[in-house]
Amino acid sequence: MATSLKNRNFLKLLDYTPAEIQYLIDLAINLKAAKKSGNEKQTLVGKNIALIFEKSSTRTRCAFEVAAFDQGAQVTYIGPSGSQIGHKESMKDTARVLGRMYDGIEYRGYGQNIVEELGEFAGVPVWNGLTNEFHPTQILADLMTMLEHAPGKTLPELSFAYLGDARNNMGNSLMVGAAKMGMDIRLVAPKSFWPDEALVTQCREIASVTGARITLTEDVEEGVYDVDFLYTDVWVSMGEPKEAWAERVSLMAPYQINQQVITATRNPEVKFMHCLPAFHNEHTTVGREIEMAYGLKGLEVTEEVFESAHSIVFDEAENRMHTIKAVMVATLGD
């Protein structure tokens, strides 16, 4: 039976079956091929899409806008300073207003409960562009990228290690994605930065059905041995006070992805992934401040690894657009 996701919200991967997730990845691969060959068919002509960004973004905004334009839709960008959400109007009321004007709504912001409320009351498909807890569109792009760089293999045949802050939205979402798709994931982090135990338990229950393997460890060499992919994210998240940097950098320094970690995988073909932006040199304001304060060349990843043949981060970034397009086409397309 054909998979239909028409009018569905896309709020977190926990809401989707492995078959539905694979369907979205396959659709993204097909849409990417169609765009590259100049044969893309527009299925969102006449659709109006609202993009709500309570947190600013480069990749997510551009990915949604280009994906929408490619498919013939019009977008309205509502930035951090351009809305009354939560100030003069509740999300429940905002959802019901925007749902009368728009055919689909993207939300990037704070608590998962906010996008869940938007999805409950909008009456049109709502897509999670990032919350504090989950980042599902990024995971679709990650899984698609892994498949592209492991030709002939399926997701259950692949393994990856995530190093760093495993309790953030990326650690959470990668664990859910791996559990759903039967993969081998190793979360390599200080124990105080492991995901919430309730989510770990939920993912282990999913893994018992899908065959996924979930490992939590503080040991870098154990965690990265023989993996196909290494993954990390920033150690300091958006909006965190600088006062928190010193302790965070001290705790995370052993989990930096550098040439020693590449070697420890014992896999000369291992690939490096990052959702971006990355602090890999001193060419950003944060990078300069970190180098001056702590003497580090790069934070979560070194320049050497980031710019090496192991790195597939820009393929991964491009695939954000293709997978976001797949979500919109599947849930809203004609």
UniProtKB/Swiss-Prot annotation:
Q: Does the keyword Cytoplasm apply?
A: yes
**GO CC annotation terms, alphabetical:** cytoplasm
| Top-level taxon of origin | Bacteria
Q: Which reaction does it catalyse?
A: carbamoyl phosphate + L-ornithine = L-citrulline + phosphate + H(+)
Is Transferase among this UniProt entry's keywords? Answer: yes
The record's subcellular locations are: Cytoplasm
Q: Which residues bind carbamoyl phosphate?
A: S57, T58, R59, T60, Q84, R108, H135, P136, T137, Q138, C275, L276, R320
Which pathway or pathways does this protein act in?
Amino-acid degradation; L-arginine degradation via ADI pathway; carbamoyl phosphate from L-arginine: step 2/2
Residues the entry annotates as binding L-ornithine: N169, D233, S237, M238
Just give the chief location class: cytoplasm
Mind listing the GO biological process terms from this record?
arginine biosynthetic process via ornithine; arginine catabolic process to ornithine; citrulline biosynthetic process; L-arginine biosynthetic process
Q: Where is the signal peptide?
A: none
Query: What's one Pfam family here?
Result: OTCace_N
Q: Which GO terms describe its molecular function?
A: amino acid binding; ornithine carbamoyltransferase activity
Q: Which InterPro entries match?
A: Asp/Orn_carbamoyltranf_P-bd (IPR006132), Asp/Orn_carbamoylTrfase (IPR006130), Asp/Orn_carbamoylTrfase_sf (IPR036901), Asp_carbamoyltransf_Asp/Orn-bd (IPR006131), Orn/put_carbamltrans (IPR002292), OTCase_ArgI (IPR024904)
EC no. given is 2.1.3.3
Which UniProt keywords are present, listed alphabetically? Arginine metabolism, Cytoplasm, Transferase
Disulfide-linked positions? none
The record's section on PANTHER family has: ORNITHINE CARBAMOYLTRANSFERASE, ORNITHINE CARBAMOYLTRANSFERASE, MITOCHONDRIAL
What role does it play? Answer: Reversibly catalyzes the transfer of the carbamoyl group from carbamoyl phosphate (CP) to the N(epsilon) atom of ornithine (ORN) to produce L-citrulline.
State the family named in the UniProt similarity comment for this chain. Belongs to the aspartate/ornithine carbamoyltransferase superfamily. OTCase family.
Protein name as catalogued: Ornithine carbamoyltransferase, catabolic
Q: Identify the species of origin.
A: Escherichia coli O6:H1 (strain CFT073 / ATCC 700928 / UPEC)
- Gene, per the UniProt record: arcB
